[in-house]
């Protein structure tokens, strides 16, 4: 059974590309036709590519890896945050701050500041500090949460990036490529697919299309996590079975020894 259906893709408007005058020739192989000056994406190829991306992301999740969701354009912000949180992953849905990946040591100091301000409020310092200073601290906190809240628990590099619109997120992609972090991306007809390891040819401007595909990547992560859980349970059950067998063998030996003694 396919990960996603043609019907789902059609209903979400995934097939609508950009105007023919705004295209990247490298996307030609993913284009089905042109209609009224707009390129129509070949959804048969999209179905296949979604499946490839899904399996890759699921494998990362099965191995305990993390995925950083990146989508700062207005149409992607809500879906990126919601789906990343649903899958327990990291996200950046506002401006990409330079160095999030390549200079994480500096970024982590700014993230640490979030906890520092929270502790100040918890300890009651806001009650004794001058009102103007408290206002400035709250502004600083809101700004930090806005840009870094989605990665505040990211203690190490993610094992993959999921990106909505490579043209918009070129800085994030450049950092990921520098660190050899694989990239999965929703790639429209005006983008360069060569920058992306797992291309999902699709409309990156329609909210429904972005939500559908971002949701599928979150589903892949959750399925992978379930696989990890099942393996852990199975391992525990095997250990318990081994212990039970050893216990039963010991009891049998004791019974035999007792019978022989009598």
Curated annotation (Swiss-Prot):
UniProt keyword annotations, A-Z: Ribonucleoprotein, Ribosomal protein
Descriptive protein name: Small ribosomal subunit protein uS2
Keyword Membrane appears in the UniProt entry: no
Family indicated by similarity: Belongs to the universal ribosomal protein uS2 family.
GO aspect biological process, one term: translation
PANTHER family recorded: 30S RIBOSOMAL PROTEIN S2 PROKARYOTIC AND ORGANELLAR, SMALL RIBOSOMAL SUBUNIT PROTEIN US2M
Keyword DNA damage: no
HAMAP family: Ribosomal_uS2_B (MF_00291_B)
Record's compositionally biased regions (Acidic residues): 243-254
Alphabetized SUPFAM superfamilies for the sequence: Ribosomal protein S2
Name of the encoding gene: rpsB
Signal peptide bounds: none
Location of the region described as Disordered in the Swiss-Prot/TrEMBL record: 228-262
Gene3D superfamilies: Glucose-6-phosphate isomerase like protein, domain 1, Helix hairpin bin
GO function terms (MF aspect): structural constituent of ribosome
Protein origin, superkingdom: Bacteria
A cellular component term, taken from the record's GO annotations: cytosolic small ribosomal subunit
């Amino acid at each position: 059974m396919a990960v996603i259906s043609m019907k789902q893709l059609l209903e979400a408007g995934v097939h609508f590309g950009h105007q023919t005058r705004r295209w990247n020739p490298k996307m030609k192989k993913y284009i089905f036709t042109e209609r009224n000056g707009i390129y129509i994406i070949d959804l048969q190829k999209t179905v296949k590519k979604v499946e490839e991306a899904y399996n890759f992301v699921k494998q990362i999740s099965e191995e305990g890896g993390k995925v950083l969701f990146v989508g700062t354009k207005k149409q992607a912000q809500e879906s990126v945050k919601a789906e990343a949180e649903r899958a327990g992953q990291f996200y950046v849905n506002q401006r990409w701050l330079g160095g999030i990946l390549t200079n994480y040591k500096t970024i982590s100091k700014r993230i640490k500041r979030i906890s520092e301000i929270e502790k100040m409020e918890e300890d009651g310092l806001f009650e004794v500090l001058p009102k103007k200073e408290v206002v400035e601290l709250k502004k600083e906190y809101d700004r930090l949460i806005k840009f870094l809240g989605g990665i505040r628990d990211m203690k190490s590099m993610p094992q993959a990036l999921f990106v909505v619109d490579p043209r918009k997120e070129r800085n994030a992609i450049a950092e990921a490529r520098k660190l050899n972090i694989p990239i999965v991306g929703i790639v429209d007809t005006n983008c360069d697919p060569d920058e992306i390891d797992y291309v999902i040819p699709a409309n990156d401007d329609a909210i429904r299309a972005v939500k559908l595909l971002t949701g599928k990547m979150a589903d892949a992560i959750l399925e992978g996590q379930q696989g990890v859980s099942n393996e852990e349970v199975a391992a525990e059950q095997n250990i318990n079975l081994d212990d039970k067998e050893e216990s039963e063998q010991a009891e049998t030996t004791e019974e035999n020894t007792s019978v022989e003694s009598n």
